[in-house]
Amino acid sequence: MEERCFRLGIKTNYKKEIFMILNNKQNKTEFIVSKMDELVNWARKGSLWPMTFGLACCAVEMMHSAASRYDLDRFGIIFRPSPRQSDVMIVAGTLTNKMAPALRKVYDQMSEPRWVVSMGSCANGGGYYHYSYSVVRGCDRIVPVDIYVPGCPPTAEALLYGLLQLQKKIKRSRKTLYWLQK
């Protein structure tokens, strides 16, 4: 029996289709897991705890973004002093060859899931010191980077925009559902 769908104006047998979809056990499991993923991602994106890894002048702009004018606390972003308490690392400034092992060690100490934000042209690709013998040409050679914030130094608004983009990326992730399908 066909029934009319009021929103689309299309005739469909939607009751039978929904029953067929929910009758399958795997579809029920995927539905529950996807809703659980949405709930977990909602909690994760609303409580980002970044750890600062300030290496140069970009760190001043990072401190500026945490001050009262931009107030990252209203987005649930609270800076943490320890890598074991944080889930986001903001790399701000010129990364030297001598500092690269320390960056990797701090990254490894962070608990899963963890994200990295590369802030400024020096952290993104070496910046003005790109051709220097002692500079790593981008922190993505040491740790996997999720968000790049351009600028020299980037403004506090740019960092805020980058962190909001990271929240959108977290909202779209489906780690549990992918794990279930393997």
From Swiss-Prot:
<dbReference type="GO" id="GO:0048038">
    <property type="term" value="F:quinone binding"/>
</dbReference>
<keyword id="KW-0813">Transport</keyword>
<dbReference type="GO" id="GO:0051539">
    <property type="term" value="F:4 iron, 4 sulfur cluster binding"/>
</dbReference>
<keyword id="KW-0520">NAD</keyword>
<keyword id="KW-0411">Iron-sulfur</keyword>
<keyword id="KW-0560">Oxidoreductase</keyword>
<dbReference type="GO" id="GO:0045271">
    <property type="term" value="C:respiratory chain complex I"/>
</dbReference>
<feature type="binding site">
    <location>
        <position position="152"/>
    </location>
    <ligand>
        <name>[4Fe-4S] cluster</name>
    </ligand>
</feature>
<dbReference type="GO" id="GO:0015990">
    <property type="term" value="P:electron transport coupled proton transport"/>
</dbReference>
<dbReference type="GO" id="GO:0005739">
    <property type="term" value="C:mitochondrion"/>
</dbReference>
<keyword id="KW-0496">Mitochondrion</keyword>
<feature type="binding site">
    <location>
        <position position="57"/>
    </location>
    <ligand>
        <name>[4Fe-4S] cluster</name>
    </ligand>
</feature>
<dbReference type="GO" id="GO:0009060">
    <property type="term" value="P:aerobic respiration"/>
</dbReference>
<comment type="similarity">
    <text>Belongs to the complex I 20 kDa subunit family.</text>
</comment>
<protein>
    <recommendedName>
        <fullName>NADH-ubiquinone oxidoreductase 20 kDa subunit</fullName>
        <ecNumber>7.1.1.2</ecNumber>
    </recommendedName>
</protein>
<keyword id="KW-0249">Electron transport</keyword>
<keyword id="KW-0479">Metal-binding</keyword>
<keyword id="KW-0004">4Fe-4S</keyword>
<feature type="binding site">
    <location>
        <position position="122"/>
    </location>
    <ligand>
        <name>[4Fe-4S] cluster</name>
    </ligand>
</feature>
<dbReference type="InterPro" id="IPR006137">
    <property type="entry name" value="NADH_UbQ_OxRdtase-like_20kDa"/>
</dbReference>
<feature type="binding site">
    <location>
        <position position="58"/>
    </location>
    <ligand>
        <name>[4Fe-4S] cluster</name>
    </ligand>
</feature>
<dbReference type="InterPro" id="IPR006138">
    <property type="entry name" value="NADH_UQ_OxRdtase_20Kd_su"/>
</dbReference>
<dbReference type="GO" id="GO:0032981">
    <property type="term" value="P:mitochondrial respiratory chain complex I assembly"/>
</dbReference>
<keyword id="KW-1278">Translocase</keyword>
<dbReference type="GO" id="GO:0008137">
    <property type="term" value="F:NADH dehydrogenase (ubiquinone) activity"/>
</dbReference>
<dbReference type="Pfam" id="PF01058">
    <property type="entry name" value="Oxidored_q6"/>
</dbReference>
<dbReference type="GO" id="GO:0046872">
    <property type="term" value="F:metal ion binding"/>
</dbReference>
<keyword id="KW-0408">Iron</keyword>
<keyword id="KW-0679">Respiratory chain</keyword>
